[in-house]
Amino acid sequence: MSPLTPHAAWLLWLLTVPVVVEVPLDTGHIDVARGRPPIDSGRRTSTQPPPKAETSGREFFASWGYNGDRYANSDIHFSQPSLGNDFTILNVRIRDSKGWTDGLFAHSLTVPQYNLRFGMFFNEKWGIELAHDHIKWIVREDQTVRRTGTLNGAPADGDVALTADVLRYQLNNGANPLFFNLIRRWRLTGEPGRSGHLVFLAKAGAGFPNPHTENTVFGVPNDKGFQFVQGWNVDAAAAVRLHLWKPFYFEFEEKLLYASYHGIKIDRGTAKNNVKASEFSWSFGVSFR
């Protein structure tokens, strides 16, 4: 047999090479031979939504800050039965004693007028707060006021000058109203639980005062010290809370408060008075979700 020519050898090699034909998978037709749709080997994109971020709004917080108060004039009633004294001084001018304006480190931590807050939010809107306001309520000396009632068993209506030897009356180590507040929260900017968000708070509540009494009536001092649950008080407040760096925040609050004090110790008797004030406070706090 004669040898293959080069052209014939090339043709024979070409005919013996296997040919692979790639057929595209038609996912729209059923595999008749198997009786079921063909298997789609491609990767499917999940239609399930990603898990939601925490939106319960539950949050715990605590803060410390300082306050200043503007007091309305007040009437103060004095009762000293064994001395025959039962009189009221009217429209008395009152002042506070901030302390922190002298410098935050000029006094010990609890000497200035301070605020202490603990609370929690149940959800994005509602929360509760325990608020202790260490405020100072001091009768201004060297003022002349109207007095009505009896003194030494006799009528004593007329004007009286409140000099140091007549009256020195103050809740200087704290009028100390304690409030149990309900809080409503509105988010103004930012996301919950993140740094850089701002919220507005409305608060209202009630409670009782725990004053530290210190006074002198007609030159005789009282047995000074703390008294507990000496009346009742209510408040309403608006505040802005700025969460600068998680979990820390600053809060600025303006509140109106009313307190009724009774059974305040004086020499051989008691006194009672009402406190009406507007109070501004600023606080530094921490919160945890």
PLM feature segments, named:
Residues 58, 117-216, 285-289:
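Gram-negative (and chloroplast) outer-membrane scaffold detector with strong preference
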Residues 74-77, 82-88, 239-289:
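Predominantly the C-terminal beta-signal and adjacent terminal strand-loop region
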Residues 91-99, 156-164, 213-221, 262-266:
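Flexible, solvent-exposed coil segments and beta strand-coil junctions
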